[in-house]
């Protein structure tokens, strides 16, 4: 993958991460919320965060001195 593809993929992942954050907050604030669904969404959000960090590290050039 080249840098442009990584940047595009990162933007999609960040958007999904933000969207999940909003959904989770909405569900937590709801009077009757499904704890199992919230846990699944939080797990997905954490996976997205890990994927974002991995892709961001690919954009940083190796500086072997």
Predicted segments with their positions:
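Extended, charge-rich alpha-helical interface modules
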Residues: 1-65
